[in-house]
Amino acid sequence: MNPNQKITTIGSICMVIGIVSLMLQIGNIISIWVSHSIQTGNQHQAEPCNQSIITYENNTWVNQTYVNISNTNFLTEKAVASVTLAGNSSLCPISGWAVYSKDNGIRIGSKGDVFVIREPFISCSHLECRTFFLTQGALLNDKHSNGTVKDRSPHRTLMSCPVGEAPSPYNSRFESVAWSASACHDGTSWLTIGISGPDNGAVAVLKYNGIITDTIKSWRNNIMRTQESECACVNGSCFTVMTDGPSNGQASYKIFRIEKGKVVKSAELNAPNYHYEECSCYPDAGEITCVCRDNWHGSNRPWVSFNQNLEYRIGYICSGVFGDNPRPNDGTGSCGPVSPKGAYGIKGFSFKYGNGVWIGRTKSTNSRSGFEMIWDPNGWTGTDSNFSVKQDIVAITDWSGYSGSFVQHPELTGLDCIRPCFWVELIRGRPKESTIWTSGSSISFCGVNSDTVGWSWPDGAELPFTIDK
């Protein structure tokens, strides 16, 4: 083979190898494209486990579930239409209280990022229950927690997180700027009511689905304030109670009917010699019952009951088992204010069952410590101090605080009645303990007609923290 033939042969072999290599590269590209095109989901968002996301779009809850199978994400959607929380059912018959949640916020906050809070409360939609709370714009064990014993400041905000979780920046949702608040769900969206501003001219901002829809101006220019617990919804309307005026004398009290975040009707109570603050309200058979705090001169609790047209009745719980704090020892009650130790008070609640009443109260008659539930079968109308059931919630040696009611509607539970529930705030820090801060955790219970147990579920945090030393 002469030199020219060698050159031609080598060139031909190189050309064949090049063509084969090019074909292999083209085949590899086609293979990658085909493999990518048959996958569904977003390959840039790898999910290590299943994840459910609930979004809200045009009055419809959209439940999106991402299922991770062999690095391939399949998106499934199930639309859950909004409902109207009717509130027409009666309260469920119950024999005791089953523990529902405990957030352990102070214990976790010694090392984790947990908000400094007060006035926590719980409210439920037809899909979920959430804990609402008033922050101080500060975290536990941080310098900004200093001086948070103060009730009203421009830094306080209403936020919420899933029930039973410690309130932190990572799981909490901003709701409103507020130093007094309420919230509830009508089956379509959350209504929030946040009061902020100066004592002599505060304004309540109403939001529906997170959007400002209305405002209410202080009408007596004397610390307008609201429930610090959930409002109550019946047939698409939500109802709340507000107070404006002295905390130690005759004040003014209004009930409001709110639809889709707008006030459609209000009524001022004609209630001389009554004092209503921080009402705990619930629906029962289409009407609203609120049990409140008398900070003026009653150691028993005042109540107001009204229908959807705001036609109302007023009274005091008659039982000789007194529900406020401070209070005298149990004795003979009154259907008006019981004066001994009637000054000051604490937010609380009761549930009416005919002539009977479940009374929640601190165990101590003088300090905010301990908690118990008492069934007085004649206590709504009778003045004796006889009761038939007592269930321990927090021991008298442990701190408690505010308490309030919430309900779970049949649309959530699947029952044919409204389940009564309550929460208890477990206050820690100032003014009773040697810290620079005041905060709290919470526990909650729901009524059941089955076995229950009395015990003590205290806050349990060991104080002081590092910041306090």
Swiss-Prot record:
What this protein needs as a cofactor is: Ca(2+)
Region (Hypervariable stalk region), start-end ranges: 36-90
Give the EC class as a word.
Answer: hydrolase
InterPro entries from the UniProt entry? Glyco_hydro_34, Sialidase_Influenza_A/B, Sialidase_sf
Listed GO MF terms: exo-alpha-sialidase activity; metal ion binding
> Mind telling me how this protein is modified after translation?
N-glycosylated.
- Tell me the residue ranges located in the Intravirion compartment per UniProt: 1-12
Any stretches that span the bilayer, and where are they? 13-33
List the catalytic residues. 151, 402
What family does the Swiss-Prot or TrEMBL record give for this protein? Belongs to the glycosyl hydrolase 34 family.
Domain text from the record?
Answer: Intact N-terminus is essential for virion morphogenesis. Possesses two apical sorting signals, one in the ectodomain, which is likely to be a glycan, and the other in the transmembrane domain. The transmembrane domain also plays a role in lipid raft association.
What does the UniProt function comment say about this protein? Catalyzes the removal of terminal sialic acid residues from viral and cellular glycoconjugates. Cleaves off the terminal sialic acids on the glycosylated HA during virus budding to facilitate virus release. Additionally helps virus spread through the circulation by further removing sialic acids from the cell surface. These cleavages prevent self-aggregation and ensure the efficient spread of the progeny virus from cell to cell. Otherwise, infection would be limited to one round of replication.
Spell out the protein name for this chain: Neuraminidase
Q: Which organism is it from?
A: Influenza A virus (strain A/Hong Kong/212/2003 H5N1 genotype Z+)
Q: Which gene encodes it?
A: NA
